[in-house]
Amino acid sequence: MAVSVRIPTILRTYTGGESEVSASGTTLAEVLDDLDASHPGIKGRILDDNGGLRRFVNVYVGNDDVRFLDDLATPTPDGTQISVIPAVAGG
């Protein structure tokens, strides 16, 4: 199933500057695997060493934060838009 993944500026070095890329998968985990196959290294910036979402990275499937759904097992229906949003901190 094809989905659209919106890539934040800080991760666009992995996508050749593309702000939106296509990926396939029926769950978020599968989409991230497919995304990493096409854009090596990007998954390591989204997931931590234990394979969970990094603490300061939010991922939305449609308008819903996956942390309040099924996390990496969240379904990703065909045509869904996924947004990767890193937290911004400053002082």
Regions found by a protein language model. Give the residues of each.
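Ubiquitin-like/PB1-type beta-grasp interaction modules and other compact soluble beta-rich domains
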Residues: 1-90
